[in-house]
Amino acid sequence: QRQMCIRDSDGPIPEVTPWVLELLEKHNIKATFFMVGDNIKKHPDEYRMVVEHGHRIGNHTFNHIRGFEYSNPDYLANAQKVDEIIHSDLFRPPHGHMGFRQYYTLRYHYRIIMWDLVTRDYSKRMRPEQVLNNVKRYARNGSIITFHDSLKSWNNGNLQYALPRSIEFLKAEGYEFKVL
């Protein structure tokens, strides 16, 4: 059985998240959304939509901060601030960056989730076809694929092009989708 996880990061964003949810529902796929606490506070309706659609939620810090740029207490406080809203046991460090002490402390409170395929859908340097080709080229059984429900991914057209075509490609290859 070939399995794949779609991980969506940086939302919720009203311009993007509803579209992602509609697409996932159309394909009967559940995903894991790693959300930024500040975005949840700004867009509670979109947060509720994700939960009501049955997707899994993870902590992505309150302000999308890089661990290496903050002291341990400040980084941990930023992560814990999200817990006041979502109470998730999943954590993903923004940009995949955190120090060893941050990791060591957080692993007692969360399942820390990374990825093996970041689509780079947020990049202005990537054309939509390149984002799709990243999925086609690097997806493997058990992959955790990262897309972003962010304005960066949306405004450059990468998300709208690559996410539906990636889902269609992976289904045609026999993959099933699961949540983390």
Model-derived segments and their meaning:
Residues 2-6:
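Short, small-residue-biased leader/transition segments that mark boundaries at the very start
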Residues 7-12:
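Active-site-adjacent substrate/metal-binding segments within catalytic domains
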Residues 16-41, 48-51, 56-61, 113, ...:
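Short, well-structured secondary-structure segments
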Residues 41, 52, 63-180:
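Catalytic domains of cell-wall/extracellular-matrix polysaccharide-remodeling enzymes
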